[in-house]
């Protein structure tokens, strides 16, 4: 018998019950005791094994994006962008690449309702011929903060109060009153699109600025955008209360049931690009994650489509153990100096090692589907069977070599070490433009949500005045409406 063929898998189920080590179990209902009513014996290894496994079924919850749902499918190139990227999976129209996607809420726990006002995660893992590519984003194209130094600090006030375990507006408004860069994100979150109807009817965005490199080594900054073919749909407060009150997993069920019924969700992938040589001509910093790139001067360019046509087989293996990291890229795609992206490159891999162990990339959902080889050996939960004698590099006994060189961005860095903010902050222009683009009733709902938040009894007069000042700088009439509703005199 080949012992490596029969690895743990549902494909090799025995016709009878066994222990984890494969020994047959003739009674899975009764403990081993001294007589029919005596104490249980410690030697009842089967009972001990069952209890020990049950006690360890749960792994650490994701610190953010704990609540989520996954599905599998494919990405197909529809437009040639080889002038921008030499990535193999983008090499020609018609090329298909397997993907797995995880949608999520951000702030609350694993069992929380999917109808809360919260950003949604939109993470895609491409299983390419040159390794995996993780595009880890959200449904909104911007973020709360622009520097990773603030990342942990911005999560804590959004999380429940550590004393009461209740999410409270005063904590959120207090923290972000120190960070007016968050205004643009709040113009999305407090808008009508703040509660997506479900995962199928929402946009996706790479959020951060990446870099595309072509075969000649020419680099372009890039933003990635997913657009659902079935359109964007959202829930207003009354609908969210109704839907969430009847099914707290409505978005997960909608995704699963739609795919099971053959109603496969589909998204188109678009990109925006900027030549780094010309970035100074814009009134925003392309590396500022709190800004969008205006589509009238930087139009969306179609790239491909993604279809989710298969449900996952096991929620734990393909959702809870599924791990994404923005550091996982392929030739033709690279990072930028986006300060938030630079932080995520480290943090995401680090949290996966904490949550799943140092060999998390060996788990089937995370492992590449292409051939791969290195000398990363051993460690906790290393289940890869390896029989080589040479576990070092280079060696004359091992033909393994370096891969062919591929282009990298030709960046030259110089400057003194310092901690500073970007020059082109411009925190108020874009949220003001968004607000003015809405219909009057949509504007009124936005105002009402802010009035409700600022009416928290623990929000001080100072904090209330700061937010009215911020929104007045974005749009004077918006600030005046807030001041009128709250009986606060605007400061500008």
Curated annotation (Swiss-Prot):
One of its GO terms (molecular function) is heme binding. Signal peptide: none annotated. It is an enzyme of class 1 (oxidoreductase). This is Catalase isozyme 1. Belongs to the catalase family. It comes from the Eukaryota. High expression in seeds and early seedlings. Occurs in almost all aerobically respiring organisms and serves to protect cells from the toxic effects of hydrogen peroxide. Its cofactor is heme.
